[in-house]
């Protein structure tokens, strides 16, 4: 890929790969963009544009070779390499993530968990011992951690993120919606459930108004 891939395109790649693997598991060898569009509910023009950032992946009238696309997107997303993850914050959300631990993605693995609550430190969740935050840096080195997930509330998020960065982790998924300050070499992805819900409600109500009977 010679030109930089747009962020919106990059965010859709895991979706494409997930559905391509489903097609592959079902024995499908070839699919056209229109059929793929109907399956994943993304406009076919968007799919073709996204794929063009990767390379010449299909032929007009033929469609896309499913096994080949799986190989291409797997290589781009580096799914063959295990990503060892540290979870910071073992409250209700943290516990849910530990219990799930990305069962559908073999290369994503939470290998250590941390909290500063003495009531949680020393307990075991889904086979993982919860450690004190003071041990984070040592475990990052010991376990080869490259990614961190923070479920720490907004008012404590910056302090938690600072410790994650200090430990040497440069990829962070943050469940606190407020933006945090990080060095230029650190990537932070935010999960803001309130914003997602408000956006959903807006589009639902807008669609309902547009399709309501005229008085």
UniProtKB/Swiss-Prot annotation:
Residues 15-54 bind DNA. It is found in: Cytoplasm. InterPro entries: CoA-bd, NAD(P)-bd_dom_sf, Rex_DNA-bd_C_dom, Tscrpt_rep_Rex, WH-like_DNA-bd_sf, WH_DNA-bd_sf. It comes from the Bacteria. NAD(+) binds at residues 89-94. GO terms for biological process: negative regulation of DNA-templated transcription; response to redox state. One of its GO terms (molecular function) is DNA-binding transcription factor activity. It holds the Pfam family Put_DNA-bind_N. SMART domains: CoA_binding. Keywords: Cytoplasm, DNA-binding, NAD, Repressor, Transcription, Transcription regulation. One of its GO terms (cellular component) is cytoplasm. SUPFAM superfamilies: NAD(P)-binding Rossmann-fold domains (SSF51735), Winged helix' DNA-binding domain (SSF46785). Its main location: cytoplasm. Modulates transcription in response to changes in cellular NADH/NAD(+) redox state. Homodimer. Belongs to the transcriptional regulatory Rex family. NCBIfam families: PRK05472.1-3, PRK05472.1-5, PRK05472.2-3, PRK05472.2-4, PRK05472.2-5. This is Redox-sensing transcriptional repressor Rex 2. The gene is rex2.
